[in-house]
């Protein structure tokens, strides 16, 4: 997200702040209190101020995955926006971690295509910087 390799990004139902899952995640069994530096280091939220490309966040309003409650995307949205970044948050009603309703799937595809059309396909070209190679 804070690289020149991308023009825009899309993140769906993510875990952006690991301090919100204080009793472990994936293969990490230590708690937040046992490994606070790790929890902060692996949390994309802590790098929100570095996100310099447009970011689309999509999340199911009823996500009951303990690592990816909707508050994860809401907080990431506010962190990027609060730091001056371009960000959009789409919350899908009645959807959990995986989106199953036809309307939600179609809406997700619409949002993703519109995002890339706006920020990638129709984006003005970047200035080239000579690298001296």
Language model: regions and residue ranges:
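Active-site-proximal cap/loop segments of hydrolase catalytic domains
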Residues: 1-133
């Amino acid at each position: 997200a804070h690289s020149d390799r991308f023009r825009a990004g899309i993140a769906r139902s993510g875990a952006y702040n690991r301090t919100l899952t204080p009793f472990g995640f994936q293969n990490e069994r230590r708690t937040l209190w046992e490994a606070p530096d790790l929890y902060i280091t692996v949390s994309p939220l802590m790098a929100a101020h570095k996100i310099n490309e447009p970011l689309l966040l999509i999340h199911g309003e009823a996500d009951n995955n303990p690592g990816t409650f909707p508050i994860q995307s809401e907080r990431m949205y506010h962190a990027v926006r609060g730091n001056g970044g371009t960000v959009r948050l789409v919350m899908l009603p009645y959807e959990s971690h995986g989106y199953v309703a036809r309307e939600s799937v179609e809406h997700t595809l619409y949002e993703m295509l519109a995002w890339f059309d706006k920020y990638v396909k129709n984006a003005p070209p970047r200035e080239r910087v000579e690298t001296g190679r």
